[in-house]
């Protein structure tokens, strides 16, 4: 949520930045109109209340002097009725303004590239060499089926499309990746480990920006009004909802493994095969709470933490700075990490690392004090995938496959796999 003072005092500047996002400005313009009406009502209400106070004193004086005060009393009855009417209208306008404010996205940081589509995202750097195969490589869904480590068919029978059973060494590979990522982030990168709830309430989804605008993308448990989490970002960020943190306790850095649940509304026909776009998938998340002046340095470090996973797995990747049109609702600046997937002959997103500045903190009321007794300020929040597990498995299967249909295990994972170096075709 944006600072309402920013909208009031810098309306045209904010409008231009939202235009750079490609936003429909209808709601934003409505905010300006309603806020102007609100200020007019406040001026009238305060004038009437001042008048009522003055006339009330006059009425009291008339009564003390045993003079007729009926006309003044009638005048104040009319004024009182008008104040009640104005107060009702003010409350209605405030409710509308709050709803509009919740629907306005974050303002892009000045370093975010201005663009009209994903084609305008800017490549920052690449790492690793894309492998050249001397045989026809298989897609990960075929590799997983042939190796008997992924079962999409029975998952579709048990649940439906966009689900998978991990089996045998496939399940063990997923578990190895989880442990490797959590160990790396907690032991070397300084994150505190968490295992969060997989269901959250409406206030939590609102705090991180999924609600009210993106409710159709979430899975709702209607009987309880709980949502299955789309990412561990939601419960971990809301861990500090309504908290006032101490400055000396910042930054707070958390890493959390969780299952994630997404309806993928609007994704019909996209990535229908394999692990790239599932309704349920596992992910290791990185979340930080920092002082405002530290947030952009923190974003670079967080992004590097996510990159380190790919470097140690020796998977080729690139980093993109996302343009204003591809920034997402809550971010002021965002980097995407894309890993090379041979079956797509392209890089595919495996992590997003974002600085939300105070956008989420205002919605969730997460603050800190610089000194005891000082006025609380909003923290800046950041998060990133460190990494998405299904896409990491897909990248390993495809990039580490051999001509005989087997898949080599990355060296960094072999210790987590009990020394297993290769997944071979069943005999």
UniProtKB/Swiss-Prot annotation:
Keywords: Aminoacyl-tRNA synthetase, ATP-binding, Cytoplasm, Ligase, Nucleotide-binding, Protein biosynthesis. Pfam families: Seryl_tRNA_N (PF02403), tRNA-synt_2b (PF00587). It comes from the Bacteria. One of its GO terms (molecular function) is transferase activity. One of its GO terms (cellular component) is cytoplasm. L-serine binds at residues 231-233, 285, 385. GO terms for biological process: selenocysteine biosynthetic process; seryl-tRNA aminoacylation. It is an enzyme of class 6 (ligase). Pathway: Aminoacyl-tRNA biosynthesis; selenocysteinyl-tRNA(Sec) biosynthesis; L-seryl-tRNA(Sec) from L-serine and tRNA(Sec): step 1/1. Transmembrane segments: none annotated. Catalyzes the attachment of serine to tRNA(Ser). Is also able to aminoacylate tRNA(Sec) with serine, to form the misacylated tRNA L-seryl-tRNA(Sec), which will be further converted into selenocysteinyl-tRNA(Sec). Homodimer. The tRNA molecule binds across the dimer. This is Serine--tRNA ligase. It comes from Listeria welshimeri serovar 6b (strain ATCC 35897 / DSM 20650 / CCUG 15529 / CIP 8149 / NCTC 11857 / SLCC 5334 / V8). The gene is serS.
